[in-house]
């Protein structure tokens, strides 16, 4: 499907950007094709009227742990113990995976189109990335780091 985003205020993300109006953003196959004057013939596009709302380039979050909501912890917790509990049964793994998928979707709905995961639960991040790419889940692009590396202590 081809879309034309109209009646929006465009912020282009450049250093000296100025809000731009009277333009349409043309999207084909999920990618921006062009930005054209709003007088352009749009008969091949489904019109999405932004009603004066802002539109800007997708944001990138370069440090994400999808196992958490991103909100500050109210108190210190033993993460290793918590991970062991979560990963100990199929029920808790299923619940945790649904939460991880929800946190990723929240990122996308907040304007973040790419997240860089830097450690998560088991293979959740990789599985979610694959499901998003297959179109079975909704979420941002995810370059996955999978697991962390630890250097041995040098005596």
Regions found by a protein language model. Name each.
Residues 1-41, 55:
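N-terminal metal-binding scaffold of metallo-dependent hydrolase/deaminase domains
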Residues 4, 45-49, 142-144:
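Conserved beta-strand scaffold positions in the cores of enzyme catalytic domains, especially
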Residues 97-99, 141-142, 149:
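Acidic, metal/ion-coordinating pockets
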Residues 135-140:
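Alpha-helix-loop-beta-strand connector modules within alpha/beta enzyme cores
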Residues 147-153:
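Conserved small/polar residues in nucleotide/adenosyl-binding loops
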């Amino acid at each position: 499907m081809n879309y034309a985003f109209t009646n929006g205020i465009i912020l282009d993300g450049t250093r000296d950007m100025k809000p731009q109006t009277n333009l349409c953003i043309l999207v084909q196959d999920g990618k921006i094709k062009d930005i054209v004057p709003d007088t352009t013939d749009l008969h091949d596009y489904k019109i999405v009227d932004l009603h004066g709302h802002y539109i800007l380039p997708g944001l990138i979050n370069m440090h994400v742990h999808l196992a958490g909501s991103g909100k500050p912890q109210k108190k210190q917790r033993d993460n290793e113990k918590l991970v062991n509990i979560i990963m100990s049964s199929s029920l808790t793994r299923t619940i945790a995976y649904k939460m991880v998928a929800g946190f990723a979707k929240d990122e996308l709905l907040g304007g973040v189109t790419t997240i860089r995961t830097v450690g998560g639960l088991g293979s959740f991040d990789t599985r979610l990335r694959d499901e998003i790419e297959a179109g079975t889940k909704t979420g941002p692009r995810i370059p996955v780091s999978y697991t962390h590396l630890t250097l041995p202590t040098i005596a």
